[in-house]
Regions:
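Nucleotide/phosphate-binding catalytic cleft detector across ATP-hydrolyzing
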Residues: 1-22, 93-213, 234, 320-340, ...
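ATP-binding/phosphotransfer module of carbohydrate and carboxylate kinases, centering on a glycine-rich
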Residues: 384-398, 402, 411-426
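Phosphate/oxyanion-binding active-site loops and adjacent basic polyanion-contact surfaces
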Residues: 105, 125-134, 168, 190-191, ...
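Conserved phosphate-binding/catalytic loops in two-lobed NTP-binding clefts
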Residues: 183-191, 417-443
Length: 450
């Protein structure tokens, strides 16, 4: 059996072909979309779980050493892994919210895969993370369809990371490929996510058109300018139809992070001062919520930084605010804060005001956010997205006949207006915002494997 597999920054999804019609496959109970999240007792549990419960072995000596270290660390902590210790999707989020202090929780590991400067052991660990998530999806699909899944087309962004170029992209794709192989896929093909989304839109065209696909996901924004229509449908070689690609690691997560920073971090000390009158360092308020930046997370949650936070607390003019920031450190609450901002962003698409409730276990903080405050907070990210749209048109040397917007963040009226202002007078259409990439990947899988 072959599938299209969208290993997304925010959600994972899979689809099959039923004749000429792609169909999403339920992968989390009756849901077609599973949040790209994982929870475990410890970081080391991921590698050991793959080996003990799924019989997935490391592919090289680096992975073997990682596994040995993981087993030793868990033994020292007295942790014996049982079958439900590793959970995914909504279950992972629920477990984290129940016990943030004693839960290792990861959201959107795809955001880290192209980061430059990773050590071999870090790359091997990310491969284990991705392998665990892919194995879970594969098992869910096989249980649902009662068939083995051996062939897969996996979506990938134009650029995985803002820096690193081809080297970054190759690193990320290699991690995905190795993880998929270890998960049990035999034949693996990659396709650009905006191209896949475009294939789904192309199936509705009755005449040839030049289409600008704008795919705004959780972690990346990708634009592809493509000639599409009846004369291209079903062709395995689309190189002549691809006019331009632009992409950057900015997406819905960045909107949420910026909104968190601008509107939710003041009760934790942002903008406050030490007794000498100097403002608190901005990085202490950015790093805990930069959930798509592995280095920022590592720096904030380091033991050395806890000493720095306690020092700032002693010198603070408003020590009660720094005490809250220390609680963010101790209870790993960065993800929770960003989630609150995400909920506010969604609500403010339809409301002029939203009241956020931050549950810090010891207290509940309530903050009102106005829509214009939200728009101001995401302005810089919005401008970068608009630039990718204009760059694709310039690179392609022609204006599109139509703009097709897709991706989980593309339903935002604010972002749709941004694209319309960049290319006025050109019709803008939307499809299945969450499912277009996945169903397009299934269409490409049929071309590759049927």
């Amino acid at each position: 059996m072959f599938i299209g597999f969208d290993y997304g920054t925010s959600n994972c999804a899979a689809a099959e072909m039923n004749g000429d019609t792609p169909q999403l496959i339920a992968i989390e109970n009756d849901n077609f979309y599973m949040p790209s999240t994982l929870a475990a007792p410890t970081r080391e549990s991921v590698s050991e779980y793959l080996f003990r419960h799924w019989n997935i072995t490391p592919k090289d000596q680096i992975g073997e050493q990682l596994l040995r270290n993981a087993i030793a660390a868990n033994r020292e902590e007295g942790i014996e892994l049982v079958s439900d210790d590793l959970v995914f999707g909504q279950k992972a989020l629920s477990r984290y919210l129940e016990d943030p202090q004693d839960t290792y929780y990861v959201k959107s590991p795809k955001s880290f895969l192209g980061a430059m400067g990773l050590r071999d052991a870090q790359i091997s660990f990310f491969e284990d993370l991705v392998c665990a998530m892919m194995t879970n999806i594969k098992k869910q699909v096989e249980a649902s369809k009662q068939q083995l899944v051996e062939d897969v087309v996996i979506g990938r962004p134009i650029n995985f990371h803002g820096r690193g170029g081809d080297k970054s992209n190759q690193q990320a794709e290699t991690i995905l490929f190795n993880a998929a192989k270890r998960a049990g896929f035999h034949n693996i093909v990659f396709q650009f996510e905006p191209v896949a989304a475009g294939l789904e839109y192309e199936s509705t065209l009755t005449e040839n058109k030049t289409v600008l696909i704008v795919d705004i996901g959780g972690g990346t924004t990708d634009c592809s300018l493509i000639n599409m229509g009846p004369s291209w449908q079903g062709k395995s070689d689309r190189s002549d139809s691809l006019l331009a690609h632009t992409g950057q690691r900015i997406g819905g997560n960045d909107l949420d992070i910026n909104l968190t920073f601008k509107q939710l971090m003041h009760p934790f000390g942002l903008g406050s001062k030490v007794t000498s009158g100097i403002e608190m360092p901005l990085t202490q308020f950015w790093n805990p919520i930069a959930i798509n930046d592995v280095q920022a997370q590592k720096e904030f949650y380091s033991r050395q930084n806890l000493l720095a936070l306690k020092s700032l607390h002693r010198d603070a003019q408003e020590p009660e605010k720094l005490a809250r920031l220390i609680q963010v450190y101790q209870d790993t609450l960065g993800y929770s804060l960003v989630r609150c901002a995400e909920e506010a962003k969604i609500a403010l698409s339809e409301q002029s005001e939203h009241r956020v409730k931050l549950n810090l276990l010891s207290e509940i903080i309530e903050i009102n956010i106005q829509r214009d405050q939200m728009v101001a907070a995401i302005e810089s990210t919005k401008d970068k997205m608009a630039k990718l749209v204009s760059e694709a048109v310039i690179q392609g040397g022609t204006k599109p006949d139509v703009i097709f917007m897709t991706g989980g963040s593309a339903s935002s009226p604010i972002l749709r207006q941004t694209v319309e202002q960049e290319l006025p007078g050109i019709p803008l259409v939307g499809g299945n915002y969450f499912g277009s990439v996945t169903t397009g990947l299934a269409r490409w899988a049929k071309i590759c494997f049927a």
